[in-house]
């Protein structure tokens, strides 16, 4: 299976600027090198720039993003429409709708751990700043034909690949407390977000988590716990936010997990190399190999090229995976003939 990982588009108007149209066209062309029927498209947040403040249309700004970006991709790759999974980023919250009471409640949550489970149920009824986003999510997945469970704080999906594997995808809203620009150390993932998600996709062969923020951005009381849970329960984790590429394959006592921090697809231009726009293709064979294709956008050539700063000359690196996703095989213990003599 192949996973196309996009992140951080930051749509800043009702239409795309010329350079952004060129980038999108180049992306669509580049995807063709890797595309196959079982591809999954993951977008790890920041559809909009600063809550869409420069989008003055009466239409939902996320619908405008879909029309300008996603629909162009679907024109070339229509099967991706039912295999697209995304989360909100910190730029996708409407901060104009956040009031003083919301900000005071956030301070209380960060101070008092025991209040966090209680607030989960309240946020499932009303999530400040996410009215437009949650409406978009509901509409986008209305005709989704496979298993789904969509809520304001986490959404979960189960799809099947052509080779019979069940893939569980968890979309975790890590941006629900992004009431200002000071995210670092001031955001949470609630226990129920994780517990409910793990339960829904528990019997899947491959488990994927998508969230906007890397682990380092969470509150100090949460970071280690979140890291351990993701490593134990998921095979692949996709994040965004930093606009910097970072790929980690972790094999610890907790489990085996690949973390992909996506580049900005369309962030602010910068002379800093790490901020060159790009995206990633993950070629994943469960229990065998994981191949990562790192792609950078060249403004000079108007096309995507290999990012060979992190991979080989072709922007590729590959790792072998020893994890066994067959639960029955995991329970099998083989004893060598040489050792059996000690058991007589």
Language-model segments: which ranges?
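Active-site environment of divalent metal-dependent phosphoester hydrolases
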Residues: 10-15, 48-52, 86-101, 179, ...
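Conserved beta-sheet core of the metallophosphoesterase superfamily
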Residues: 216-293
């Amino acid at each position: 299976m192949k996973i196309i990982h996009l992140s951080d588009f930051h749509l800043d108007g009702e239409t795309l600027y010329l350079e952004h149209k060129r980038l999108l066209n180049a992306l669509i062309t580049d995807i063709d090198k890797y595309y196959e029927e079982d591809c999954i498209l993951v977008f790890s947040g920041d559809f909009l720039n600063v809550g869409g403040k420069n989008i003055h249309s009466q239409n939902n700004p996320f619908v405008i993003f879909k029309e300008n970006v996603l629909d162009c991709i679907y024109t070339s790759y229509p099967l991706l429409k039912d295999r697209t999974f995304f989360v909100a980023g910190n730029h996708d919250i409407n901060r104009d709708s956040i009031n003083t009471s919301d900000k005071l409640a956030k301070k209380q949550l960060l101070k008092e751990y025991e209040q966090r489970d209680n607030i989960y149920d309240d946020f499932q009824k009303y999530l400040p700043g996410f009215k437009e986003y949650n409406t978009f999510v509901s509409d986008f997945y209305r005709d989704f034909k496979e298993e789904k469970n969509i809520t304001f704080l986490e959404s979960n999906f189960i799809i099947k690949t052509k080779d019979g594997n069940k893939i569980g995808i968890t979309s975790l809203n890590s941006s629900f407390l992004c009431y200002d620009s000071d995210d670092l150390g001031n955001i949470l993932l609630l226990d129920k977000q994780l517990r409910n998600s793990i339960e829904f996709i528990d019997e899947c062969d491959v488990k994927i988590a998508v969230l906007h923020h890397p682990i380092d951005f969470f509150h100090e009381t949460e970071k280690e716990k979140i890291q351990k849970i993701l490593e134990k329960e998921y095979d692949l984790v996709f994040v965004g936010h930093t606009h910097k590429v970072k790929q980690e394959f972790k094999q610890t006592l907790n489990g085996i997990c690949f973390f992909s921090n996506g580049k900005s697809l369309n962030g602010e231009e910068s002379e800093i190399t790490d901020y060159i726009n790009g995206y990633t293709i993950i070629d994943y064979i469960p229990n065998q190999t994981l191949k990562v294709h790192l792609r950078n956008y060249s403004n000079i050539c108007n096309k995507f090229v290999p990012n060979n700063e992190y991979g080989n000359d072709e922007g590729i690196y590959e790792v072998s995976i020893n994890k066994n996703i067959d639960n029955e095989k995991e329970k099998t213990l083989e004893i060598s003939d040489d050792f059996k003599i000690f058991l007589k």
